[in-house]
Amino acid sequence: MLFRSVAVIDPGPDDPEHLEGLRAALRNETVTHILVTHTHRDHSPAARALKEWTGAKTYGFGPHGKGRIEGGIVVEEGGDMDFLPDVAVRDGDVIDAAGVNFECVHTPGHTSSHICFALREEKALFSGDHVMGWSTSVIVPPDGDMAQYMASLRKLLTRDDAVYWPAHGGPIRDPKDFVASFIAHRLDREAQVLAALRDGVTRIPDMVPGIYPGLDKRLYGAAGLSLLAHLIQLVREGRAIADGEPNLHAIFRKIGRAHV
């Protein structure tokens, strides 16, 4: 039987049923490289088991929180705190994997250590959660950063990738238009936040119903985190102020002119 050499990107969660399926899918393959886009629990934990089975090295930007603008304790629940790559890669590095070249494209925002992998031979970008096929990424502070996310989206517009293969959703065959729509969506959301501040709505829990009309109340927490990411960016840029540390319970006020 002929075994192919393959690289596995984001092997997934450390779940027994998932690991069994992963092992079955790879039974006729020779895994030479394990590439990790970012350290969330649905992406990186299975890398440890896959490495044990195959002996392949793991590649990633670094441990969870690597690349964050500000230090401090990691508080988000979805981080894989145990991941540490065998090979730490940086923006522009090229991985020769099973005869093909993967260019590492650092795209912080969804997480500070997020990396996309560009398959040069096919002008294809494995975009992880930076660009997903069905919605914009959730940006959860402190490891998620809205300013970094927007800069990383604009960075992709300078590239010539023809197709994106996201971790969630189908292939994206009009990547530049797709990314431009994500940028426009986030700028619209930012404008809504500034409008709320202008109207005297100063607390995130009071902003959510107006900015997300009709949203299931069970999702208010996630929506609030997204607004917090926008507000942290506005505070850093001097377009808003917070009474004390900017967090979900802070009082925010608008200063200066709105960015439109």
Annotated model-derived regions:
Residues M1-L2, H259:
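Short, small-residue-biased leader/transition segments that mark boundaries at the very start
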Residues L22, H168, V193, L234:
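Residue-level signal for inorganic ion chemistry
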Residues T37-H43, L50, H110, H168, ...:
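Histidine-centered divalent metal-coordination motifs
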